[in-house]
Structures are given as structure tokens and as C-alpha cells.
Regions:
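Metal-dependent de-N-acetylase/amidase catalytic core
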Residues: 1-10, 85, 97-279
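Active-site rim/loop-helix segments in enzyme catalytic domains that contact anionic ligands
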Residues: 1-113, 273-277
């Protein structure tokens, strides 16, 4: 159903895949409602993903500009599937520090797009030092959100206050830590059950740079999506950390969806769990 008052949502990810993997469903839900969604990968992730682009994994490295071109092509395809706009920045991944100039450029995007909601990484998300860009980008975006409303900011664009910031929870490497995939608790769930196939299509657009096979896409969707959906009582969900106080006039009764289930490790069935740990 179209939204009578369209939202403007900006997603800032360290790498293009971060935005698609974490929020493709949310993006699809909102573009279908008539909302305006802007994806902003802060880097191409060319250094991090370069080995994946080698003819055989680990067989060598390709020129960065070649990798960037490949990733940009893939990201454009994914955003087209999702109905989102793309603003690709060109900061260096793996060594992104969140300098004044980098924060200023992010600030200008916020002031220009004027989003109601900003989505980015949790500032503590280093994935056990494997992904330092996550935390650094999250911190830089949080600073830019504040800076966007500072009248002394070095920008020709008018100031703007972002009212809502959602964070992707800080996480373990889920391939290694399947039982506890996030180390910061999610408290905001988006039901993406109706757009799960759109998310799958968007993820498959990244198959060149991240080796996203059909099997990997299915694992991400039936693993984490179902895992968090079970926690929320829906078939599939994407999760966030809501950073602002949530105020209500009074407490309300809440119905739990029919898919409420035991929180199993991603990809596990109840039978597997019982066989491993017993009843």
C-alpha cells in the first residue's frame, strides 16, 4: 500500500554488500510503499573483496579499478531490483578512518537528501577485527548525522536534523559463531516476509564480487532471516538497534505472530537441535 507521506531513508554501508545483505528486504518494503530509498556504500570494498574476484580464490589480485567497476555494476543491478537510488562513494576500504573530509562528504549527502531515517553500522561492529570498516563507518555516519544539524558545518547546503537512526547490530563472523550471531541485541524488527524473493534476487546480483551462489543466498535468507523472524513471530525479518527513546502513552497488549518459534541457530531445524542437545 502506498505511503501517504513518503519516507526518505538513507542507508550508509561500509561496502555495497553490507547494505544489500542487511537491509534489502527493508528497502524493498519501503520502495513498494512509495518511499524514497538511497543506498550509500562508503567504499567499494575493492580491497576486501579482491581475492573473491580472482579466477580461483587466492590465486592473485586484480587491479583495483577493475574490481571497482565490477562491484559498481553489481551494486547498480541490486539497487535496480530493489527500486532504490545509489550514491557510491570512493573512500578506501580497510583503511577508512573517518577523517574530517570524509565526514564532511557524508554530511553533505545527508543535508542534500534530507532523510527521515538513517541506517548504518553499529559503532562497535568490528566483527572481531575482520571488518574494521564497519565500526569506523558507523562512527563517521553518527558524527555526520549530528554535524548535519550544526549551523557551523562547512557546507553550502542548509542544515537538517535526522530524527531516527537505526543501526545494524554488531555481529560475530556468523560463519564461525552461528549460535550467537550478534553481540548487540536487536530491538527493532522489520517483517520482510512478503519481499523475500526480491531480497534473494538482489543478493544474487553480487555473485561476482562475493561469490554469492544460490546456496549462499538461500543460507542467508533461511538462516538469519528465519532466525530473526522466529524471534519476532513472522516468517522472515531484518533487525536493527533503535537508538532513540521509544515513548508510549501507555502499555498495550501485543499479539505474537503464528510463526513464533524457539530461537534456533541459523539454518538449524528443531530436529537437528534436539538431536545435538537433547530435549
Amino acid at each position: 500500500m502506498p505511503n501517504k507521506e513518503p519516507l526518505r531513508i538513507a542507508l550508509f554501508g561500509a561496502h555495497p554488500a553490507d547494505i544489500i545483505f542487511n537491509s534489502a528486504g527493508t528497502m524493498a518494503v519501503h520502495t513498494a510503499r512509495g518511499d524514497k530509498v538511497l543506498a550509500v556504500p562508503v567504499t567499494y570494498g575493492a580491497r576486501h573483496c579482491n581475492p573473491f574476484l580472482a579466477p580461483v580464490k587466492g590465486a592473485g589480485y586484480r587491479p583495483l579499478e577493475e574490481v571497482k567497476a565490477k562491484k559498481l555494476e553489481e551494486t547498480k543491478k541490486a539497487c535496480k531490483v530493489l527500486g532504490a537510488e545509489l550514491h557510491q562513494l570512493d573512500f578506501k576500504d580497510q583503511v577508512f578512518v573517518g577523517s574530517h573530509e570524509e565526514i564532511q562528504e557524508i554530511t553533505d549527502i545527508i543535508r542534500g537528501f534530507r532523510p527521515d531515517i538513517v541506517i548504518t553500522h553499529h559503532p562497535t561492529d568490528t566483527a572481531f577485527a575482520d571488518q574494521p570498516d564497519h565500526a569506523t563507518v558507523g562512527t563517521a555516519v553518527m558524527r555526520a548525522v549530528k554535524y548535519a544539524n550544526e549551523w557551523g558545518a562547512e557546507s553550502k547546503k542548509p542544515g537538517f536534523q535526522v530524527n531516527t537512526v537505526l543501526l545494524w547490530p554488531a555481529h560475530h563472523d556468523t560463519a564461525m559463531y552461528r549460535v550467537t550471531p550478534y553481540i548487540t541485541p536487536a530491538n527493532y524488527y522489520v517483517d520482510i516476509s512478503d519481499v523475500i524473493e526480491i531480497k534473494r534476487r538482489a543478493m544474487r546480483c553480487l555473485e561476482g564480487s562475493m561469490l554469492v551462489t544460490e546456496e549462499a543466498a538461500n543460507a542467508a535468507i533461511t538462516g538469519m532471516g528465519v532466525f530473526w523472524g522466529g524471534a519476532a513471530g513472522v516468517p522472515h525479518a531484518e533487525v536493527y538497534v533503535y537508538t532513540s527513546p521509544f515513548v508510549v502513552k501507555h502499555l498495550e497488549r501485543r499479539e505474537i505472530g503464528p510463526h513464533r518459534q524457539m530461537l534456533l541457530p541459523p539454518g538449524w531445524t528443531l530436529a537437528q537441535y534436539l538431536e545435538t542437545f537433547g530435549e
